[in-house]
Regions:
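A short acidic, amphipathic alpha-helical/loop segment
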Residues: 76-83
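Rossmann-like AdoMet/SAM-dependent catalytic core
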Residues: 52-56, 104-139
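Conserved S-adenosyl-L-methionine
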Residues: 1-5
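A short SAM/SAH-binding and catalytic strip from SAM-dependent methyltransferases
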Residues: 61-75
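Conserved beta-strand signature within the Rossmann-like core of class I S-adenosyl-L-methionine
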Residues: 86-99
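S-adenosyl-L-methionine
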Residues: 20-56
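Carboxylate/His-rich catalytic cores and anion/metal-binding grooves
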Residues: 17
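Conserved SAM/SAH-binding beta-strand->alpha-helix loop
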Residues: 10-13
C-alpha cells in the first residue's frame, strides 16, 4: 500500500514506532507527517483530529484497530470513534467483555450510528468470545 498511515498510540510507543520504521527505510514522523506517502506516529487527540481533517476524501482508506479500542476507557473510545466515520473500510478486533464493559453492545450501537456502511461481525474461531467487526462504506 502506498499512501498515508496514521498510528495512534501512547507517546513512548509512538517514539519507538517512528524509530523502528525509520530504521527500515520508511518515511515516519513522530507527530503529524505532511507527506501523503508517510507514517504519522501520533499520540495526541488534537494531532489526530488535524491529520484526519486533512485526509484526502478521494483516496481509499482503511481503519484498523486490533483490541486497542475495546480496551480503552469509554470516554476515550467514544471521542476517538466520533472522529473516524469517513473511512472506506473498517477492521476492528475486540473481545466480548473487557472489565465491566460489554463490547458487543458497545460496538453494535456504534456501527448502528454509521448508516452508510455494510457491517459484518464475525467470531474468531481460535479466540472464543473475540470478534472481527468489518465495515464497508456503501456510497
Amino acid at each position: 500500500f502506498k499512501g498515508q498511515y496514521i498510528i495512534f498510540d501512547l507517546p513512548v510507543f509512538s517514539a519507538l514506532q517512528e524509530f523502528y520504521l525509520k530504521s527500515i527505510g520508511i518515511n515516519a514522523k513522530y507527530g503529524a507527517n505532511e507527506d501523503t506517502n508517510g507514517v504519522s506516529c501520533i499520540f495526541k487527540i488534537e494531532a489526530l483530529k488535524e491529520v484526519l481533517s486533512n485526509k484526502k476524501s478521494k483516496k481509499k482508506s482503511i481503519f484498523i484497530a486490533t483490541w486497542s479500542i475495546s480496551e480503552a476507557p469509554i470516554y476515550l473510545r467514544s471521542l476517538f470513534l466520533s472522529m473516524i466515520g469517513n473511512f472506506d473500510v473498517f477492521l476492528i478486533a475486540y473481545q466480548r467483555q473487557f472489565g465491566e464493559t460489554d463490547n458487543s453492545t458497545y460496538f453494535s450501537a456504534w456501527k448502528d450510528s454509521l448508516k452508510n456502511y455494510q457491517w459484518y461481525n464475525h467470531e474468531i474461531r481460535h479466540l472464543p468470545n473475540n470478534y472481527y467487526l468489518f465495515g464497508k462504506n456503501t456510497q
